[in-house]
């Protein structure tokens, strides 16, 4: 019995010694207090529905992120190079990361998705154990054509990767979209319908997903993980207007989007 009490005493004493060290281990979010540039369209633009109560404001409130917002209502992927130039003009390299939330307007405008690469047959020097010599092989290079979504993304990412090679760049897929009517000349059907060039909205989402692999950047799939599905009446609580605008989010929708990003960003470094 005495031996047992002695062991318990020793273990208790050891626990007390280790407790201060354990208590000092505090998790710090990798994006805490960082400076982030936001590129995109109306879902990010403070001049659009929900104003400053956007997802990036949730990140500011919860993580202390300083937002540099360059998104403009109605813009498509071909505007990203301009937004990048504006960032460089105003902040140079004095920021930590870039977040791009774009693609829904490319779908609405009927911009074809296109392909990532053009292929050609060329001569290239190679050797695999034998004397080096010229070989005939197929080569592919990124499409740099602003008339397709893939081409636009290639142009934008090539520019950003060239301008800011040491910065973290995170792509956000578009979220689901439903009916929106902004006047007789601007009526946007839901994602249940193909666009004017005969492509589904999900094809544009998939292109942003693939862009992560093409350009070696992380992608947060908000289409899948945001939990917001505007085609259902039950999700009207997250939308700007249940009758006329099921495209844009209200502050509650952005709060949910921002909360999702807080946790998704835990898995990514902001700086290197």
Language model: regions and residue ranges:
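Bacterial N-terminal signal peptides
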Residues: 9-20
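Serine-esterase "nucleophile elbow" of acetyl-processing enzymes
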Residues: 22-73, 78-93, 98, 233-234
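Residues that line or immediately flank small-molecule/substrate-binding pockets and catalytic motifs
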Residues: 12, 40, 102
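Bacterial N-terminal signal peptides that target proteins for export
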Residues: 1-10
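Solvent-exposed, charged interface segments at domain starts and junctions
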Residues: 7, 22-34, 139-152
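Alpha-helical cap/lid subdomain in secreted, periplasmic
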Residues: 62, 84-272
């Amino acid at each position: 019995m005495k031996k047992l009490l002695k062991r318990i005493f020793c273990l208790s004493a050891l626990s007390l010694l280790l407790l201060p060290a354990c208590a000092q281990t505090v998790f710090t979010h990798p994006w805490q207090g960082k400076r982030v540039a936001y590129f995109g369209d109306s879902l990010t633009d403070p001049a659009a529905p929900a104003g400053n109560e956007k997802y990036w404001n949730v990140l500011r409130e919860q993580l202390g992120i300083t937002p540099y917002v360059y998104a403009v209502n109605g813009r498509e992927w071909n505007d990203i190079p301009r937004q990048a130039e504006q960032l460089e003009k105003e902040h140079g390299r004095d920021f930590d990361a870039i977040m791009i939330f774009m693609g829904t307007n490319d779908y609405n405008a009927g911009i074809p998705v296109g392909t990532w690469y053009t292929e050609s047959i060329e001569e290239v020097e190679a050797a695999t154990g034998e004397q080096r010599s010229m070989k005939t092989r197929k080569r592919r290079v990124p499409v740099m054509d602003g008339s397709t979504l893939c081409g636009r993304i290639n142009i934008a990412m090539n520019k950003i990767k060239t301008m800011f090679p040491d910065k973290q760049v995170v792509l956000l897929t578009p979220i689901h979209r439903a009916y929106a009517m902004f006047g007789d000349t601007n009526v946007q059907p839901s994602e249940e319908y193909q666009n004017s060039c005969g492509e589904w909205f999900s094809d544009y989402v998939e292109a942003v997903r693939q862009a992560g692999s093409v350009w070696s950047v992380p992608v947060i799939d908000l289409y899948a993980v945001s939990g917001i599905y505007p085609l259902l009446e039950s999700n009207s609580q997250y939308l700007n207007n249940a009758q006329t605008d099921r495209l844009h989010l209200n502050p509650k929708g952005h709060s949910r989007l921002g909360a999702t990003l807080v946790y998704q960003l835990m898995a990514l470094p902001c700086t290197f």
